């Protein structure tokens, strides 16, 4: 069974340009922006934690343009089985870093390499 297309989750307009650059690298990926803080996202959401947890439970690869700690704390209660994790990455808002967080068996390192190459940087 194939995974859904990746979700690029952003918290503010400052991340939108980087999110769109990543989206160009990943056919079918969508940009999800925080309602009231992001204009021009493909879809909006109102609660970061609920949204990221729902994406994770739906096996959707997650590319979060925010601090890695926010993503880790959000998903910590759901981390049960390493083999069943979708890829989860944190990307710096300014496109200076790509950090694979979860989903080593699910292709997170390959996804990190694709994104990093497209942004002209090395993955962490």
What are these model-derived regions, one by one?
Residues 30-55:
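N-terminal beta-loop-helix "entrance" segment that forms/cooperates
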Residues 8-10, 22, 62-63, 70-72, ...:
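Weak global preference for isoleucine
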Residues 96-124:
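Short, glycine-/small-residue-rich phosphate/pyrophosphate-handling segment
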Residues 2-37:
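N-terminal basic/disordered segments at the start of proteins
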Residues 44, 51-102, 107:
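Glycine/small-residue-rich interface belts in oligomeric ring/scaffold proteins
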Residues 24-28, 61, 80, 84, ...:
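Generic secondary-structure signature for well-ordered alpha-helical cores
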Residues 30-32, 84-87, 110-114:
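Short, surface-exposed linear patches
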Residues 17, 21, 54, 73-77, ...:
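Alpha-helical scaffold segments in soluble metabolic enzymes
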């Amino acid at each position: 069974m194939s995974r859904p297309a990746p979700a690029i989750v952003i918290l503010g307009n400052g991340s939108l340009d980087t999110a769109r650059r990543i989206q160009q690298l990943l056919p079918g990926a969508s940009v999800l922006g925080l309602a009231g803080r992001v204009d021009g996202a493909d879809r909006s959401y109102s609660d970061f934690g609920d949204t990221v947890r729902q994406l994770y439970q739906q096996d959707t690869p997650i590319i979060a343009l925010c601090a890695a700690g926010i993503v880790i704390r959000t998903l910590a209660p759901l981390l049960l089985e390493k083999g069943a994790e979708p890829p989860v990455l944190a990307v710096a808002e300014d496109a200076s870093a790509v950090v694979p967080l979860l989903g080593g068996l699910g292709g997170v390192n390959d996804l990190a390499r694709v994104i990093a190459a497209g942004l002209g940087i090395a993955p962490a």
